[in-house]
Amino acid sequence: MQVDWIEFPKDDLSAFVATMGYSRASYVEYVDNEKIETLLACHMNAFRYFGGVAHKCLYDNMKTVIIKRNAYGRGKHKLNPLFEDFAKHCGFLIKVCKPYRAKTKGKVERFNHYLRYSFHNALRVKLAMKNYQVNIDNANAEVLKWLDNVA
């Protein structure tokens, strides 16, 4: 599973995006922060949505996952202890990309583009026509329908 955040600054929102490696099935959850507690909750919701825990999860260098690269030698990173304990508890391996190599997570990066331009921008326009703004509640309700019927 490849995991990333995508930011929507005009709406003061971020979206947690998880894309499975082989099927490319994706899960999206809109949030108002990218704190460790939010990241853990989003993972649990993604695992529930997919019906199980992925064997490996791939991340970029987000501070909620990795504190310092190569802290204990090449390829031996200092991980956020809360996140490391969470991964052990759930039973998945943590993999991290090399810095500035977002293409390593190409599946989730491609889906982020699709989410932004096929879903989020369309939702903003649809809601603006009714004098509404995108918020966590309406974005999460609509994105689940979109994931199940379109994406």
Predicted regions and their residues:
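Mobile-element integrase/transposase regions
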Residues: 1-26, 35-41, 88
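Short small-residue beta-strand/loop micro-motif enriched in glycine and branched aliphatics
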Residues: 24-29, 67
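Active-site beta-loop-alpha junctions of metal-dependent nucleic acid enzymes
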Residues: 28-56, 76-77
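Acidic/histidine-rich, metal-coordinating catalytic segments
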Residues: 53-74
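Short secondary-structure boundary/capping segments
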Residues: 71-76, 111-115
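Two-metal-ion acidic nuclease core segments, chiefly of the RNase H-like superfamily
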Residues: 75-94
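Charged alpha-helix within mobile-element recombinases
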Residues: 91-151
